[in-house]
Amino acid sequence: MLVSGVPCPELNAVWNRNCTNYTGKVRALGAGAEAGAMASIVCDTSLVWHRVTADSLAQSLEARFQYFTERVMPHFKKDSMYHTCVFVPSYFDFVKVRNWFKSSDLDYSEVSEYSKDKKIAQARDMFYHNEKHFLLYTERCHFYRRFRLKGIRHLIFYQPPTFGWMFSELSNLLQKSFQNPRGGSETNMSITVIYTKYDIQRIKLCVGAETASKMLSSENSRHIFQPGAAE
């Protein structure tokens, strides 16, 4: 018997290779597993999904990083794109992204599972009060701390989160009640997601199984959604 809060490639591999039974096997999904967390997003901000092409899982790591630094970040470096939060699920990716931010001399603060409480409070305060352009945030930190970060006007998912509820929870932080009134215009807000075909299980949790399949089989590499429906 395998029990997990979320589907993942590692468990799928064990299931397919090692879980054999002459009477067969059964897989049960939790209630709402087909709907996707996007149905729980209540803010009016459009969600833009960018598909990155890669021929292997190993290649996808560098392809994602290259797409992020060369295709996504040039737009968010503009002065009009202050209050940008970059959410990074993997700590190894987080370190790589943080090192790139340092070498590029970008104005940022960071919150991770290894950050001290004093540093976290300082980083959040500077981000909210326009003193830092970017905030780097890790998935593991959010899993344990569940910070309701204020001041986010632009949210970048470096990779879809492991847990679907994180996708809707973080996206809903763009609501007006979490904003600094002096931080910018309500018309200048965005949610960006970078994904590859190897993120299929994570994508399903975010947008639902049917929509995820359509996204991966589509000729278009860019998809725009409003909360609850695709454009």
Predicted regions and their residues:
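Conserved helicase ATPase core of P-loop NTP-dependent helicases/translocases
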Residues: H83, D93-N99, D105-Y144
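Switch/connector loops and helix/strand junctions flanking conserved nucleotide-binding motifs
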Residues: E10-L11, V95, Y144-R148, F163-F167, ...
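Conserved segment of the helicase C-terminal RecA-like domain
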Residues: L2-S4, N172-G228
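Conserved RecA-like helicase motor core of SF1/SF2 enzymes
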Residues: K132-H133, Y137-G183
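Conserved interdomain hinge at the start of the Helicase C-terminal
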Residues: V14-W15, L29-L106, I203-V207
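Short glycine-/polar-rich loops that comprise or flank the Walker A/P-loop
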Residues: M81, L106, K150-R153, E186-I191
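Structural motif
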Residues: S4-V6, S56-Q59, F87-Y91, S112-S115, ...
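Post-DEXD/H (motif II) to motif III coupling segment of the RecA-like Helicase ATP-binding lobe
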Residues: M1-A31
